[in-house]
């Protein structure tokens, strides 16, 4: 991941955020879910597809399973998907 993108994610990670980043021949699609009270979260990509007029990206934040021991530390879950550079807009669903 490019350093500039890492810096941008670090600056935004406390709040829910969605962004794209272009570098050379790559498109990075990013969704951050903000501050969570514990660890144990995962992110599932529900959809990533190119339609006629846009790239669609849908993700879900999945919390810790009930009864699972989780760390009591703050976490900032986010996902970065790298794909080929495209000119279409990204629609976050």
Pin down the residues of each PLM region.
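Exposed, flexible binding/inhibitory loops of compact, secreted disulfide-stabilized domains
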Residues: 1-93
